[in-house]
From Swiss-Prot:
Family matches, as SUPFAM superfamilies: Class I glutamine amidotransferase-like (SSF52317)
Catalytic activity: 5-[(5-phospho-1-deoxy-D-ribulos-1-ylimino)methylamino]-1-(5-phospho-beta-D-ribosyl)imidazole-4-carboxamide + L-glutamine = D-erythro-1-(imidazol-4-yl)glycerol 3-phosphate + 5-amino-1-(5-phospho-beta-D-ribosyl)imidazole-4-carboxamide + L-glutamate + H(+); L-glutamine + H2O = L-glutamate + NH4(+)
Listed GO biological process terms: L-histidine biosynthetic process
GO CC terms, sorted: cytoplasm
Role of this protein: IGPS catalyzes the conversion of PRFAR and glutamine to IGP, AICAR and glutamate. The HisH subunit catalyzes the hydrolysis of glutamine to glutamate and ammonia as part of the synthesis of IGP and AICAR. The resulting ammonia molecule is channeled to the active site of HisF.
Source species of the chain: Prochlorococcus marinus (strain MIT 9312)
Protein name, UniProt field: Imidazole glycerol phosphate synthase subunit HisH
Glutamine amidotransferase type-1 domain segment(s): 3-205
Amino acid sequence: MHKIGLIDYGMGNIHSVTKSLESLGEEIILIKNFSESKACKAIILPGVGAFDPAMINLINTDLIIDLKNWINSGKSFLGICLGLQLLFESSDEGKVQGLGILKGKIQKIPNIVNQRIPHMGWCELLPTKTNTLLELEELNNWVYFVHSYHAIPDDFSIIAAQVNYGSEKLTAMIENDNLLACQFHPEKSGKTGEKLLRRWLSNIQ
């Protein structure tokens, strides 16, 4: 069992993430101040909603410097959905600067015939490299998405998995050293989500 810090900044699906991790035997500590993270082995930044209000909430709760220090120190970190997007420098959705931990930006999902926005529902993960959650050739991992914007990193090598969206492929997962982030919702992805969370937890130092 680990103590996992869940950043509580008013924009996260706190209940479902907590319930999912507690079902795996983990202890969850809600973090509104980083003094509460001292006993934690990993931090999760969840997120649902819009980019600007989320960043403003992080700014107003004075969590940004400590969050960056946590990630830069090499400790385990997981971003979920909007929690992935906030890691980048900016978003077409708003005007507030992102955390800038990752270089790149968040763009509106392109309009494609017969594809709806938001991109919503169950889709198969397509690994682009062997990573903490998936082997390169591992298929049949279907997970739940709901988003209207997607990440375009400057360094494509940090993309760990993609998802098909019509003729396009969108970023589904990012991995950069100790930082892992999912555009999909593992906590809403049934047995597959449980399996992926178990793999992440097993890699926590």
